[in-house]
C-alpha cells in the first residue's frame, strides 16, 4: 500500500510531507513511487510511529489486576484504537503470587486481541 502525501514525523523531530510504502503492516520506505498497490490519500493527515503506553492499569472498566483474559483483550482493543502498539501493564502493590497471575494473564492475552 502507498500512503500518499501524509505529513510524516521524522527522526529530526519535524513533520515532512512524504509518500509512505507499507508492506505486511510495516513501513518499508518513504517517498516510494506509486505502483499497482493500494493508494491511500493522506493529504492533510499526520503519520507517526505506533505509541508505547508505559503505564497502563486498564481501560473500559477493566483493570490488569482483575486477571481476566477477556478484560485484557478489551483493554488492548481500546489501546490499539488509540494508536498504542505496545504497552506495559501496570499493577498495584500486591502479593508476589497475585503479580504472577496478573502478568501471566497479560501474557496470555498479548497478541490475540482483535481490533
Placement of each model-derived feature along the sequence:
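Histidine-rich, glycine-flanked metal-binding segment
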Residues: 1-2, 8-48
Amino acid at each position: 500500500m502507498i500512503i500518499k502525501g501524509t505529513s510524516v514525523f521524522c527522526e529530526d523531530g519535524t513533520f515532512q510531507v512524504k509518500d509512505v510504502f507499507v508492506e505486511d503492516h510495516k513501513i518499508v520506505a518513504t517517498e516510494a513511487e506509486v505502483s499497482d498497490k493500494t493508494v491511500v490519500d493522506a493529504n492533510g493527515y499526520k503519520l507517526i510511529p505506533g505509541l508505547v503506553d508505559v503505564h497502563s492499569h486498564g481501560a473500559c472498566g477493566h483493570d490488569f489486576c482483575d486477571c481476566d483474559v477477556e478484560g485484557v483483550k478489551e483493554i488492548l482493543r481500546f489501546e490499539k484504537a488509540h494508536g498504542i502498539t505496545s504497552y506495559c501493564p501496570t499493577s498495584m502493590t500486591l502479593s508476589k503470587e497475585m503479580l504472577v497471575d496478573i502478568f501471566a494473564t497479560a501474557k496470555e492475552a498479548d497478541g490475540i486481541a482483535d481490533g
